[in-house]
Amino acid sequence: MATLRVDEIHKILRERIEQYNRKVGIENIGRVVQVGDGIARIIGLGEIMSGELVEFAEGTRGIALNLESKNVGIVLMGDGLMIQEGSFVKATGRIAQIPVSEAYLGRVINALAKPIDGKGEIIASESRLIESPAPSIISRRSVYEPLQTGLIAIDSMIPIGRGQRELIIGDRQTGKTAVATDTILNQKGQNVICVYVAIGQRASSVAQVVTNFHEEGAMEYTIVVAEMADSPATLQYLAPYTGAALAEYFMYRERHTLIIYDDLSKQAQAYRQMSLLLRRPPGREAYPGDVFYLHSRLLERAAKLNSLLGEGSMTALPIVETQSGDVSAYIPTNVISITDGQIFLSSDLFNAGIRPAINVGISVSRVGSAAQIKAMKQVAGKSKLELAQFAELQAFAQFASALDKTSQNQLARGRRLRELLKQSQANPLPVEEQIATIYTGTRGYLDSLEIEQVNKFLDDLRKHLKDTKPQFQEILSSSKTFTEQAEILLKEAIQEQLERFSLQQQT
């Protein structure tokens, strides 16, 4: 048996003592007393902050929402099926934040900014708080740059500016998502970063939107944040704030961003579910008292920054679903009062084949013509009034037996104006083509055509104008004004096309 020498033992002991690192740390620990329905109640955690992240022993994370005298109410960011009563919970000392970087462009992620498109991890060196304060009054400037949606009805009569918040509201299946996605498609080549947030949607619907973006080449400048209908309520509640944090990252880097929240009704329902399970007192329609603050703190983050901050912008298009056209319900009235206008989609118009089914009469943009180029103001200034008068006259005409010639002409013009506002999905128009289309309708060039021929004629006119009068587009894009020269070119193109069209009809 070999004998150990004293000096060897001494050397080993000395090495062990030198390697010993006495590190003492204090951790805020609690214990689970109740768990279920996406909620956990914890005793302990005396030093926790509101909104702080906590970590359970088996790895699930949660957010502290209710801080009570005897326990803490935690909402779980997962199913929590493996959490056991009596297990330990550790406070992390951090408020919820996500990584942010340019690498997120073209990706589909969840509310925790984790990729769900199977294309691998996203490398990011920076992070942002999911909930950060909105820009102050001093940090902002008034909205003055147009954000073109590519939809004639919106760009001519309900203009949206960069930094504006415009609500898209309507019943289910009226084309709300189509208006939002067409707006994203129209940002191609406009140097605008788009974020599409899907809250509580069917996975098949989100997949269809993503496929559409890929086919049209829009994913290059778009980030999709998706929490499906089967996701925990906590993640559905967080998804819009995650999207806003990503959009803010680009806004503060002097970029223009557009964010779609589809839709905030589902987020409010998820928040109501969480609040009721946390035993917060219910208010109107069983929503908690702070549901207005839920949406106001989200939508106030949209802004047009001043020149000192780089003039970046974040334009928000929240979507809210109504029941049977009832805009006086709790969530619709809340969001209407927060936003800078609303685009109202009508199921009656949709069923009548008028798509996009925008009710121009009760839709409004509180920014108004400040968000339009001068050429559009010159051409489309009276369109909304003419359509409103047409709708009024049409209602009257149902009861009148005979109408005078002026009223008949006004009705005929109104029907053609309504016809030119029709657009197929995923077919946004450049502003120059919109101006040509509206001018043709408002100046009476369509009056001689049958209503069924209007859209065919306008398609041919736009193609003819592009092929034979490229100077028209150059004048509008350079001067942003509908000059005399532009008007002469457009009149020539319309006359030529009318002659060609009448010949085609004869043959």
UniProtKB/Swiss-Prot annotation:
Membrane topology: Peripheral membrane protein
Compartments (UniProt record): Plastid, Chloroplast thylakoid membrane
A Pfam family hit: ATP-synt_ab
Molecular-function GO term, any one: ATP binding
Catalytic reactions of this protein: ATP + H2O + 4 H(+)(in) = ADP + phosphate + 5 H(+)(out)
GO terms under cellular component: chloroplast thylakoid membrane; proton-transporting ATP synthase complex
Site feature: Required for activity: S363
InterPro entries named in the record: ATP_synth_asu-like_sf, ATP_synth_asu_C, ATP_synth_asu_C_sf, ATP_synth_F1_a_nt-bd_dom, ATP_synth_F1_asu, ATPase_a/bsu_AS, ATPase_F1/V1/A1_a/bsu_N, ATPase_F1/V1/A1_a/bsu_N_sf
Subunit structure: F-type ATPases have 2 components, CF(1) - the catalytic core - and CF(0) - the membrane proton channel. CF(1) has five subunits: alpha(3), beta(3), gamma(1), delta(1), epsilon(1). CF(0) has four main subunits: a, b, b' and c.
Name of the molecule in the record: ATP synthase subunit alpha, chloroplastic
Organism of provenance: Lolium perenne (Perennial ryegrass)
Lineage: Eukaryota, Viridiplantae, Streptophyta, Embryophyta, Tracheophyta
